[in-house]
Amino acid sequence: MAKPVTEFKFADLGLRHIDSKSFEPLHDVIFLFAGTRCPVCEALHAHYFSGEAEYEKQRRYVVFSGEHPQRVKDYSISHNLPSERVLLAGDLFARIGVTQTPTMVFLRRSEDMLHLENAVYIPGVSSLGEHLRNVANRAASNDL
């Protein structure tokens, strides 16, 4: 297996929204790599997007890699995912080194680059909350 890529130019991410618009991050971002056939992922969605006011420096997205766009669109609708926060990825999953879902990936933006800060497997809701709080604390101290 190739060594994971840790820096990306925006154009190299290969991400797009469900409506096919390309994705260009304006801030640091958090990606939750998920799958349409992942029961743990389903349990996380509502918690992942809750409490955003307290984490306003973060930008959260759910990323589906290697999934058919219509399947992702249908899944997003049935799970009430905000369409502007759902992204489709080509091989970004593999390039970052994500090996299972759900995995949360933290990327810091600087100029025209995103830098991989951390990637963690999320086994459940309590783990998700813990990692989001840690990121919020680091962002508040400008340490993310």
Functional labels for PLM-detected ranges:
Residues 10-12, 84-90, 123:
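Short acidic-hydrophobic, aromatic-tinged amphipathic segments that line or gate anion-handling sites
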Residues 27-28, 43-65:
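Conserved helix-turn-beta segment immediately C-terminal to the redox Cys motif
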Residues 1-21:
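N-terminal "domain-start" segment that seeds a small globular fold
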Residues 105-143:
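Non-catalytic, surface beta->alpha helical segment in thiol-disulfide oxidoreductase systems
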Residues 20-42, 48:
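Short active-site neighborhood of thiol/selenol oxidoreductases, capturing the structured segment around
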Residues 48-51, 72-76:
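Hydrophobic packing residues within well-ordered alpha-helices of enzyme cores
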Residues 78-108:
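Short, internal strand/loop/helix patches
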